[in-house]
Amino acid sequence: MIGLTGQDEGGRMQTVDAVVVGAGHHGLVTAALLADAGWDVLVVEERDEVGGAVASRVDGDWVEDEFSACHPLALASPVLRDLGLEHHGLEWAHAPRPLAHLAGRDRDGIALHADPLDTAADLDRGHPGDGAAWLEMVEQWQRVREPLIRALLTRWPPVADAARLVARLGLREAPDLARMALLPVHQLAREHFGGDGAAQLLAGNAMHADIPPTAPGSGLYGWLMTMLCQDVGFPSPRGGTQQLARALRLRAEAAGARVETGVGAGRVVVAGGRVHGVELSDGRRVRVRRAVVADTSAQRLYEDLLDPADVPAGLRRRLARFAWDLPTLKLNLRLDAPVPWTAPQARGAGVLHVGHDVPGLIRWSAELEAGEVPGAPFALVGQMSTIDPSRSPEGTEALWLYTHLPRHRPADAAAVAATVEGCERLLESLAPGWSQHEVGRWVQTPGDLEGADANLVGGAVGGGTQQLFQQALWRPVTGLGGPRTHVGGLYLGSAATHPGGGVHGGCGHLAARAALQDARWWGRPRGRALTGALRWLHDEQP
């Protein structure tokens, strides 16, 4: 492929150090960090608003999050914390009670309280001894929290952070933590607790990912989300999730980055095995001195933005087996009163997991994996006005539920209708008479989610499955477990690459870090070697 040619309207080629394609939260993190280093950075976003899947819509007095809503990992992430977003208007809101789990026609439920002692007391009432086991788990979390989160969000392999983790735990305890990372969540619960309450909290939190509860890795995810919830709650940006994206944009612009919305990338130009620039959707051509970072899906980068001649056959074949996470269906409801939950634990909870106990979750997940529409859904629920009263008029509730459809039926209208009806029946069983308070609704099908954000293919809000076979070295395809591509100076900085889905900024941080390292004179040989290794790998037959 030949390099960029031609001129812009001013009679000259626009040249910058780096172009970031896509202003999702990862792209904005990349832009801020590159601009901090003195780079001239241009961010282009085809939507009219920045944020990608970190977005809200405002309709009168109602503020509704379009995609993600509650972000414990964002609050705990060292990447986002180090950006100082509180200086750019970000404020976190918390519900009185972070979480409750209601299984079936549960009249009581189990709550995760803000104070771990209160959580432990509830668990102990359900099964004596579980309270002490809970506090032991919390104590271990507090010891490993910082090195573990850094290890999960840093480049692969996380040698330095793993060493700090071992030093924190000791050689006797570290192997047990490594084993726990491989456990299915139901086995993790069985080994630590005698009652159902803690098991439901762990398994419900594991369902924030698409890892089946019987699969390796679901234990780690359930434990991580549960301990984060016990540590920082399930917070949401005050005024809507869009406020997080707004703060990231302001932070990037304060560092000197330029952010343009309403204009996307049409083509990434490569010549001689190295990125040269980007042709924009409005006809402009932008040459880059150093890098292009794509905050896009891997498919968008390799199948649309790059010329087919610039994509090795081995990479195309590997990408064809990329697995998306389960399609998401989201039901947004406006109620003129609080939800009439029968379970006291549900009142005042910001997030709820509703519909099944642990055996029920195993059956629900198996139905989805078998390609069937579950007869009885499991849903994640957000009471956003309970978390943040500014989301709706006083005395009302902005409520959402989301659940999943089988992978191969995201556009099936009958499956969507049946699942919406199932969610309505589930809500009626737990909060009789809720529908009498409904004053508005907004259903987001998998197709709607993808239409609003092209990275969410088929309604896959995680940017690809989070199961172990597609993490680290295998995300998005077999490689080196990082943002580098087979093209020099071209980086993938989205949830499609390690460390994967979630609002944490790690993918954008790693892309910026790699670009900065490869641009320094002492880092260039290593960068060229890694790019060459990827080119060799993808030229081989998978």
Spans of features found by a protein language model:
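Mid-domain catalytic core of redox enzymes
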Residues: 266-392
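Helical element adjacent to the flavin cofactor pocket in flavoenzyme catalytic cores
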Residues: 225-279
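A conserved FAD-binding loop/helix module that cradles the flavin
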Residues: 68, 493-516
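A glycine-rich dinucleotide-binding beta-alpha-beta segment and adjacent secondary-structure elements
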Residues: 195-210, 374-380, 433-498
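Flavin-binding catalytic cores
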Residues: 127, 338-339, 372-375, 413-454
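Rossmann-like flavin
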Residues: 104-216
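N-terminal glycine-rich phosphate/pyrophosphate-binding loop and immediately adjacent elements
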Residues: 14-151
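Active-site-proximal substrate-binding core of FAD-dependent oxidoreductases
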Residues: 270, 518-542
